[in-house]
């Protein structure tokens, strides 16, 4: 059985995630009507590049701050929390500033040569301003997670989302519906301004929280070195995965153009799948994403105490929940594809692709649960390796199959990639759960402290 605290926190986070998902889906539907499929596709291409830069900006600091603060709190007296956070914030500011400067300097070559559309250059330059905000918010969010007060960053993210929507809607009133360059820039500017607001709110909450709970009563031991040993390996693996994923997204419109579609038709096809259908497929996943995140400290606690039976029971319960829930969601999306596509996006193409991709939901949702179990058992390196292998294989398939078979090949590659990822991850989890009980006993001490503290 899943523990009561896990169920309680899952329901709490699910409620917040559901509210934000509803707001985000409504805004995405409005954007689809306001920008059109081609405009939405142009925005998605821009976000794929800014997402890579955001990975450079964060550079593993979210988990590093969570782990480092949790280790300091593990002493029971608050340790040197403020000193640890100063290092995390400096690291975040350095990486965020560097990523922002790099994006600003390379905006033209990225827009012209990499994305292949000059209309994205202005948006890339605007997005560069938000990179320090993203990295600093990640460090602060990690602090609140370690302290067990996750409602504070959740409040900041909700305020960020609402402000971003309001600002974007206001900025779009100043651009013509057919001017995709200015429309995309307006969306990017709204997001960047909202990131700045989120940072200001989170920093105020952090200062109040730190003064209320923690003061440095002792010097931390080699805090900078400990932080870098956590952040750098995570950053390197995230760079690889994000770069491969970005290349995948950039290859799709080019491959569709090579298959015979015009530039706008290729952008429209990409925009329908990535900007309309995929958000709708992931919209109901908030329940499983919350459970998969919160099961990490639960499994680690069982692991350190050598409770092999509880590990198997907890993991099995989550996987059964994910399978039942995802099958129900898949059936509803498949049967109601025409209604949802027409009602939300006013698009027959969205309805058609939604029906084609609905059977993939059980695979995606179950993979989400399996990844949570692997991280809770200290097998996140395997999970990252599988994700990188999936992205690399998908990149090769897109390069050779998309120009020949168009959107049909793209959908087939999505199916193959998700099945490949789930198969390898599930086999690794099954092998671990079926291994000798001694294999489930000794995670590293830092992981244990982090798990216990995050689960409080």
Give names to the regions the model predicted.
Residues 63-108, 122, 135, 309-329:
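Membrane-water interface segments that mark the loop-to-transmembrane alpha-helix transition
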Residues 20, 28, 59-66, 126-145, ...:
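Short runs within selected transmembrane alpha-helices of multi-pass transporters and secretion channels
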Residues 98-116, 328-346:
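Short membrane-interface helical motifs at transmembrane helix boundaries
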Residues 5-63, 100, 104, 130-131, ...:
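Signature of the first transmembrane helix
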Residues 9-24, 190-206, 221-294:
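Transmembrane helical elements of multi-pass membrane transporters/channels
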Residues 170-177, 193-218, 249, 371, ...:
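C-terminal transmembrane helix end/exit motif
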Residues 59-74, 281-305:
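Helix-loop junctions and terminal segments of transmembrane helices
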Residues 1-23, 79, 83, 218-241, ...:
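N-terminal membrane topogenesis motif
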């Amino acid at each position: 059985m899943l523990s009561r605290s896990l169920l309680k926190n899952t329901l709490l986070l699910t409620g917040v995630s559901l509210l934000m998902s509803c707001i985000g889906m409504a805004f995405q539907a409005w954007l689809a009507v306001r920008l059109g499929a081609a405009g939405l596709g142009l925005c998605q291409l821009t976000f794929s590049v800014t997402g890579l830069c955001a990975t450079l900006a964060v550079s593993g600091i979210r988990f590093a701050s969570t782990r480092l603060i949790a280790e300091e709190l593990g002493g029971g007296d608050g340790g040197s929390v403020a000193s640890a956070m100063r290092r995390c914030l400096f690291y975040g500011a350095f990486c965020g500033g560097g990523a922002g400067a790099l994006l600003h300097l390379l905006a033209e070559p990225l827009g012209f040569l990499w994305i292949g559309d000059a209309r994205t250059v202005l948006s890339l330059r605007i997005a560069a301003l938000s990179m320090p905000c993203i990295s600093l918010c990640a460090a602060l969010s990690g602090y609140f997670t370690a302290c067990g007060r996750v409602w504070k960053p959740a409040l900041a993210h909700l305020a960020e989302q609402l402000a971003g929507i309001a600002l974007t809607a206001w900025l779009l009133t100043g651009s013509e519906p057919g001017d995709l360059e200015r429309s995309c820039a307006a969306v990017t500017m709204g997001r960047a301004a909202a990131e700045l607001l989120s940072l200001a709110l989170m920093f105020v909450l952090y200062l109040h929280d730190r003064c209320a709970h923690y003061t440095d009563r002792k010097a931390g031991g080699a805090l900078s070195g400990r932080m870098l040993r956590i952040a750098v390996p995570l950053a390197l693996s995230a760079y690889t995965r994000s770069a491969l994923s970005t290349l995948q997204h950039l290859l799709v419109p080019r491959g569709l153009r090579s298959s015979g579609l015009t530039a706008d038709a290729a952008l429209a096809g990409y925009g329908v799948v990535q900007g309309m259908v995929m958000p709708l497929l992931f919209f109901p996943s908030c329940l499983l994403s919350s459970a998969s995140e919160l099961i990490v400290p639960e499994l680690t606690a069982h692991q350190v105490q050598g409770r092999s039976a509880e590990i198997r029971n907890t993991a099995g319960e989550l996987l059964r929940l994910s399978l039942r829930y995802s099958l129900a969601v898949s059936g509803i999306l498949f049967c109601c594809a025409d209604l949802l596509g027409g009602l939300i996006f006013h698009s027959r193409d969205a309805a058609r692709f939604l029906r084609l991709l609905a059977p993939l939901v059980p695979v995606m949702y179950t993979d989400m649960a399996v990844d949570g179990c692997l991280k809770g058992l200290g097998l996140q390196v395997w999970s990252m390796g599988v994700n990188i292998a999936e992205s690399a294989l998908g990149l090769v398939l897109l390069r050779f199959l998309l120009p020949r078979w168009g959107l049909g090949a793209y959908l087939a590659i999505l199916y193959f990639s998700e099945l490949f990822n789930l198969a390898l991850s599930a086999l690794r989890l099954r092998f671990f759960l079926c291994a000798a009980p001694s294999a489930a006993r000794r995670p590293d001490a830092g992981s244990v402290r982090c798990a216990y503290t995050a689960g409080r």
